[in-house]
Amino acid sequence: MLNPKMKWFALLLLTSFQAQAHTDQLTQISFQIGLLHPLTGIDHLLAMLLIGMTAALTPKTKLSLPLVFSFGLLIGTLATGWLNAAMNVEPWVVGSVVVFAALVWGKTRINPPLQVGLVGIFAIAHGAAHGMALPSTPDVASTAGLLIGSLLLQSIGFAVGQRDCLRKTLALDTRMTS
């Protein structure tokens, strides 16, 4: 059993800062910034989760929505400078959350090709917003981190959506058998 001082020391070790003894520290930091960025803004966090949920709830677009969103995110991130001058992306980001929420809660039904197109447009806006928020010009490491973080959130949303589908299916089965 650890004495109380050792417990505090162990806790301190767990919370220590990253060692900066590596030659590729800028790449590591850049990757971490990209990875954490989708988690730090509520609009981006909600959008990624809702995309995953929408994909789970829409059988015809299960794979295409996350892939189109990720590709649009990449395009938007890489075209940040041009998109920044061409449009104000923040209203598009907020609008995407509203549209994705309507799709999840079933208040809006649109055909799958239009749904995929909307997701692509909103993804480009999200990518531009992410690219503008990064501390420097988007590089390979930060962009890879951004895509991985976004796909992780979409996967969580997909799992939640699948669980919801299963729950609804089981509820229908119990109603039919009783």
Question: Which positions does each model-derived feature cover?
Answer:
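Membrane metalloprotein/metal-transporter helix-bundle signature
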Residues: L2-L11, F17-S178
